[in-house]
């Protein structure tokens, strides 16, 4: 059966905030956004336990994101696995801009203090990382992305009066100038920028195709059914599979009922290689993952399983919104999963683009940008994935950048924005934060309110729908 308007999922959804009071505070923080399409989920903030080959238990932590990920001990010293011995050891510089294993084992959990003292006497640097990497076909750190990756992404969306009720008035410009926001420039899809300049719908109904990818070596693994994924993506209100609401609910709440994300779920597509292959030893941070994306899209198109025209409602020749969910555990959880795969041999959730060879359906609909997340939660069992990561990556698809720290020196805006802490206050991804007023302003979901010059009389508490 071809997925199209004749069998799409339709529901009457109501925002959990539609009858409640919401007060927004606009934080005056500066955000650097370089227009690249590569964005991703931050690492699991919780530490994890690994077992050394000799049975010793050690406590490690995954840091960063796909651009720049590294493993450290509880004190922040970089750890690598020795490929010869299999032991986790402290990293050291190799003299050529890279890292190599030292001979010092990571301090175990049951250490009496002697090993720790011996380790600290080495005067190691915390958060040690390679200074040189080949980023020509890989998601890398911020500076390397800026200088070496092609310009993939659309700029943050500019405002137009017919879309958001904002004109190029003094007040509108003041909104951006007061808070040191660089106003985004609108780019039409006709611009010569590999098709990435187009603007996504942020009001009304946004049709989202959800493609389920099963790695070749996962053919017999238990995974959520398409019907279960439909609950995760579309359900109205709490459900045992999505106890705090669905991904659709997240965007209804954040947009004050302005954006209705309508997701249509495919059956599982078994791709033509293994999880280990597509992860490529670096958490799927290289262009090898594009092979899986392309394979699944061609399979769906060649077998007439998806009406791609239906997902190009604005008829600009590009799919309106697309989500990929895979059959493995997310690399961003760190550690080793129940099947023995370390995080580097799993896929890290991210949003990127097929900028070398975009997919084009038989009817002429192009898929350039995509985002991908795990369908499973954690590192073991077959529990369905959660809304935090999918909502975060969908936010990127709408054009919002990451707002978390990427160099280990801080936490960015932290719990004040979905794009900074999609794990939520308890790390379970059931309670991802609301988007900040800054983000909602960029997406056209709030309208700035300016007090008049001079003295203003204001109520101690005032409700203003979709206002700052």
Give residue spans per PLM region.
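Sec-dependent N-terminal signal peptides
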Residues: 14-26
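Extracellular hydrolytic enzyme modules, especially secreted metalloproteases
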Residues: 321-323, 327-468
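N-terminal secretory signal peptides that target proteins for export/translocation
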Residues: 1-16
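Residue-level micro-sites within transmembrane alpha helices that shape
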Residues: 18, 31, 391-395
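C-terminal segment of classical bacterial N-terminal signal peptides
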Residues: 29-37
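Zymogen propeptides/activation segments of proteases
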Residues: 3, 36-363, 468
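A broad, structural surface signal
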Residues: 1, 294, 298, 388-396
